[in-house]
C-alpha cells in the first residue's frame, strides 16, 4: 500500500471528497491541515501554488478534482465502463462550473464583506447558478434506477455531489422540503456505513 499524505487547509471544501473516499475504503493516510502561516512557506514548493496536494510515496499531485479522479480510478469508483466514467466526469465538471459562483459567496463571507454585498452575491449570483446546477443533478437522478448518479453503484461523482449538498445546506442554499429527490440521494450516500461513521466524527466546517 502506498503512503498517502493529504495537505489542505482546516476545512472540508475541495479536499473533503478525497477524505471521504479514504475513509470509506479504510485506506490509511495522513490528513495534514495546513495553517495560514505555514502556507506562505509551503506554496512555492507545490506544483500549482494551490492546495490540496496529495503526496504518494513522496510524489506530489495537485488540483483537487484530478486527485479525486486519480483515486477513484485507483479504487474502482470511476465507473464500470468508459461511458460511465464519462458521465461521472461530466457531472463533476458541471459541479466545478457551479463552484465558481458558490465560492464568490463563501469568499465574501470569509473576508468580511458587508451584508449588502453578501446578499447581492447570494441572490443575484449564486441562487440562479444553484437552480441550474440542481436541475441538472435532478435530471440524472430522475433517470437513475439505482439512486446513484451513474450506473448501479457508487462513483466519485456521488461523493463529490453529496458533499457539495452539505455545503449548500449549511449556507442556506438548499431546502430538502422542496428537493425530495436530492434528499433521498443525500441520505443514500450518507447511509453508507463507512461514510456515516466518518461524517459523524469529522471536524466540521461550513464549506
From Swiss-Prot:
Family per similarity comment: Belongs to the GST superfamily. Sigma family.
Statement: the UniProt record of this protein carries the keyword Cytoplasm: no
Record-level GO cellular component terms: contractile muscle fiber
Residue ranges of every copy of the GST C-terminal domain listed in the record: 81-207
Catalyzed reaction equations: RX + glutathione = an S-substituted glutathione + a halide anion + H(+)
Official protein name in the record: Glutathione S-transferase 4
Entry-linked Pfam families: GST_C_3, GST_N
Enzyme Commission (EC) number: 2.5.1.18
One GO biological process term: glutathione metabolic process
Positions bound to glutathione: 8, 39, 43, 49-51, 63-64
Induction text: By paraquat. Induced by white light exposure.
Domain GST N-terminal: 2-79
Superkingdom of the organism of origin: Eukaryota
InterPro entries registered for this protein in UniProt: Glutathione-S-Trfase_C-like, Glutathione-S-Trfase_C_sf, Glutathione_S-Trfase, Glutathione_S-Trfase_N, GST_C, GST_superfamily, Thioredoxin-like_sf
Keywords for this protein: Transferase
Leading EC class: transferase
Function statement: Conjugation of reduced glutathione to a wide number of exogenous and endogenous hydrophobic electrophiles. May play a role in the detoxification of reactive oxygen species produced during pathogenic bacterial infection.
GO molecular function: glutathione transferase activity
Amino acid at each position: 500500500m502506498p503512503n498517502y499524505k493529504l495537505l489542505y487547509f482546516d476545512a472540508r471544501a475541495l479536499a473533503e471528497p478525497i477524505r471521504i473516499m479514504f475513509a470509506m475504503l479504510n485506506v490509511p493516510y495522513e490528513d495534514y491541515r495546513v495553517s495560514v502561516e505555514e502556507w506562505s512557506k509551503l506554496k512555492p514548493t507545490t506544483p500549482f501554488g494551490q492546495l490540496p496536494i496529495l503526496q504518494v510515496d513522496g510524489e506530489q499531485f495537485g488540483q483537487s478534482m484530478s486527485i479525486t479522479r486519480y483515486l477513484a480510478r485507483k479504487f474502482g469508483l470511476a465507473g464500470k465502463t468508459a461511458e460511465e466514467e464519462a458521465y461521472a466526469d461530466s457531472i463533476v465538471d458541471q459541479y466545478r462550473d457551479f463552484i465558481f459562483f458558490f465560492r464568490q459567496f463563501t469568499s465574501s463571507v470569509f473576508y468580511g464583506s458587508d451584508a449588502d454585498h453578501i446578499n447581492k452575491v447570494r441572490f443575484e449570483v449564486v441562487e440562479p447558478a444553484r437552480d441550474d446546477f440542481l436541475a441538472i443533478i435532478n435530471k440524472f437522478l430522475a433517470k437513475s434506477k439505482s439512486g446513484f448518479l451513474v450506473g448501479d453503484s457508487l462513483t466519485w461523482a456521488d461523493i463529490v455531489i453529496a458533499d457539495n449538498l452539505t455545503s449548500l445546506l449549511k449556507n442556506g442554499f438548499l431546502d430538502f422540503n422542496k428537493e425530495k429527490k436530492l434528499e433521498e440521494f443525500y441520505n443514500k450516500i450518507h447511509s453508507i456505513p463507512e461514510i456515516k461513521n466518518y461524517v459523524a466524527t469529522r471536524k466540521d466546517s461550513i464549506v
